Amino acid sequence: MARRRKEVQRGESRSHRSRTRSKTAHHRKFSRRQLRPSLRARLNAGIRCHNRFYRALVRSLEEVFEGGGDGRLAYTIIPQCKPAGGKIVVMFEVNLGLRKPDCICLLETQHEMKCIVIELKTCRFSKSLMTESKLRQGYTGTLQLRDSARLLENLAVPGTEKVKILSLLVFVAQRGMNILAVKTVGETVINVSSELFFVTLATRSQYLKTFCAKLEPRVSHARSKYQQESAKNADLASPAPSALQTVAALFSSRVGKESATKPASYSTSTEESKNLSEPCFDPDSNL
């Protein structure tokens, strides 16, 4: 009897264990089924937000260079996005090997060239930037930007031109595409060949677009300035007239005026003038 009771107890314990195992397995499967759609939804929402940000940045740069808007998004991220007489090349999803930064902007002017690496972090809630998820995003974004700057330095062909690499971490709200924060992670200067550097990044990017700044029309102003300078130079080249020259000029002008006002008879010979001066009498006339 005792053995039978023990066997029954063992069977009950085994059945209880199997039931608990099945329940825990069911809960695990249910929790995984619940988590997977949420993770996928978050991932898809982040991808959609990235694509919307790319389109918004291109549209904002078009407003800056072509007019028709204030270009608030572009100026918020890159204050010097419209260089005088320069250009900016925007590249998205640049494959650097171990890292793939979201956006790289090449800003070229007459004096310098900048390579701005942008890592984008999308946020569902924009009330506070000190939450656990945002702090984690900031930490991972900082590591990604440092690796990207190191990979850019390794990929660049050495040259004589200096390129400043500026790393920016941008937090964007998924709703409204508002810029929550822009943080500068690091800044380095490398000596490269600018043409080969551009070709290397262009071949590794999925999408790029170039914006060129138009020169301001200063032709009329330059002409007037040139005319003023030429007039000044002409005044300096011609010496001031002396006193004798001024007197001679006045005398010649006075003589010209007198000759113009004299009658025609005044220019005759002396004999004719004498005959004209003497009175002519007619003998037949009755005085």
From Swiss-Prot:
Q: Where found in the cell?
A: Virion; Host cytoplasm; Host nucleus, Host nucleolus; Host Golgi apparatus
Region: Disordered; residue ranges are: 1-33, 254-287
Is Protein biosynthesis a UniProt keyword of this protein?
Answer: no
GO annotations of cellular component type: host cell Golgi apparatus; host cell nucleolus; virion component
Which spans does this entry mark as compositional bias, Basic residues? 16-33
Q: Which Pfam families match?
A: Herpes_UL24 (PF01646)
Q: What is the induction note for this entry?
A: Expressed late in the infection cycle.
**Keyword set for this entry?**
Host cytoplasm, Host Golgi apparatus, Host nucleus, Late protein, Virion
The entry assigns this protein to a family as follows: Belongs to the herpesviridae UL24 family.
Describe its function. Answer: May participate in nuclear egress of viral particles. Plays a role in the dispersal of several host nucleolar proteins including NCL/nucleolin and NPM1. Since deletion of host NCL/nucleolin negatively impact on nuclear egress, UL24 supposedly acts on this process through its effect on host nucleoli.
Please give the name of this protein: Protein UL24 homolog
